[in-house]
Amino acid sequence: MLPSMLPPKSLRAVRIAVWLLALVPFLRLVVLGATDRYGANPLEFVTRSTGTWTLVLLCCTLAVTPLRRLTGMNWLIRIRRMLGLYTFFYGTLHFLIWLLVDRGLDPASMVKDIAKRPFITVGFAAFVLMIPLAATSTNAMVRRLGGRRWQWLHRLVYVTGVLGILHYWWHKAGKHDFAEVSIYAAVMAVLLGLRVWWVWRGARQGAIAGGAVPLRD
């Protein structure tokens, strides 16, 4: 039987392990950069790498609740904030690479790039939505906003997930290469679909308990 909670020492060890594992992609980029091993197109390499890890960690963050509900491992909730902050970290790197390196902080160049490649607008929107999520991730902000308002705000992560997939899909559409993004889209669909199912089932059970006549299946 899977443990619902972990002893403090075990939980601390898990959190440290997750922290280190999530840091590995960044350290890899640093090492590859220091040894001049980014390949023929360094900008494309670091942009793709940071974007990929943003999406991977976003999926991991969204997977915490389904895994907790399906396995009963309630201790998983203790690593969700860390995963979310790492998602924001890699998303920030991804954005800054485009802003500082690709566009050189040139407003005219940025506007032109957005007009030419609208998928960048979608990616920027996803990044902007992550900012309030990261800013309100502390316990102090939960208390300040109140649990219910905090939960409503953090539902923006679902919109961020959809926009992230759309950003990647739109980018790959120009190359007609949908193999990898289709995997992420399928994972995201499952993670969000489970939530929709649980909400629908809860509402249906509530209606039955209240004496309403359910619709036929």
Curated annotation (Swiss-Prot):
Entry's localization field: Cell inner membrane
Key words, A-Z: Cell inner membrane, Cell membrane, Electron transport, Flavoprotein, FMN, Heme, Iron, Membrane, Metal-binding, Transmembrane, Transmembrane helix, Transport
Highest rank taxon of the organism: Bacteria
Transmembrane segments: 82-102, 118-138, 150-170, 180-200
Main localization category: membrane
GO biological process: protein repair
Cofactor(s) listed in the protein's UniProt record: FMN; heme b
GO cellular component terms attached to this protein's record: plasma membrane
Membrane topology recorded in Swiss-Prot or TrEMBL: Multi-pass membrane protein
Cofactor note as given: Binds 1 FMN per subunit. Binds 1 heme b (iron(II)-protoporphyrin IX) group per subunit.
Family, as annotated: Belongs to the MsrQ family.
HAMAP family in the record: MsrQ (MF_01207)
Subunit note: Heterodimer of a catalytic subunit (MsrP) and a heme-binding subunit (MsrQ).
Record-given protein name: Protein-methionine-sulfoxide reductase heme-binding subunit MsrQ
Organism: Ralstonia nicotianae (strain ATCC BAA-1114 / GMI1000) (Ralstonia solanacearum)
